[in-house]
Amino acid sequence: MGLEKSLILLPLLVLVFGWVQSSLGKETSAQKFERHDMDSTGSSSSATYCNQMMKRRNMTQGYCKPVNTFVHEPQTAVHAVCSQKNVTCKNGNSNCYKSHSALHITDCRLKGNSKYPNCDYQTNQLQKHIIIACEGNPFVPVHFDASV
């Protein structure tokens, strides 16, 4: 009888372990925003900044991400945008917020002749207002929507 119970519990334990292991490795939307769009340490005047950062942040694996923006402000300043002016997101959702002031950003755009695996980006340092989507409790940035 003990062996039968063990054989019944074993598949259940394997399923539970697999679920726990896969959920531990998942990146939240807020963590993805941090990885894709935050560089609080400051911008670089190097023309290769985007090439380095896109690779370092795993945005050139399997394909070249065409556009990305890095925000060079303290995390607290970017999180504060979630309580600023509410605007409509590009996709029509109503959870986007526009910064009151222009922030330091770097715009990375894939050069026209660039192809994977040799992703080559144009680096543009700018000061613009940012529009970000915010969600959760606490309310935090989860998506970079635009710069204006």
UniProtKB/Swiss-Prot annotation:
Gene Ontology biological process: defense response to Gram-positive bacterium
Tissue expression remark: Pancreas.
Pfam family, one: RnaseA
Span of the signal peptide: 1-25
PROSITE patterns, per database record: RNASE_PANCREATIC (PS00127)
Bilayer-spanning residue ranges: none
Cysteines paired by S-S bonds: 50-108, 64-119, 82-134, 89-96
Record's keyword terms, sorted: Disulfide bond, Endonuclease, Glycoprotein, Hydrolase, Lyase, Nuclease, Secreted, Signal
InterPro entries named in the record: RNaseA (IPR001427), RNaseA-like_dom_sf (IPR036816), RNaseA_AS (IPR023411), RNaseA_domain (IPR023412)
Gene3D superfamilies associated with the record: Ribonuclease A-like domain
Subcellular location(s) per record: Secreted
Gene Ontology cellular-component terms listed: extracellular region
GO molecular function: lyase activity; nucleic acid binding; ribonuclease A activity
Family recorded in the similarity comment: Belongs to the pancreatic ribonuclease family.
Protein name: Ribonuclease pancreatic
Protein source organism: Chionomys nivalis (European snow vole)
Gene this chain is encoded by: RNASE1
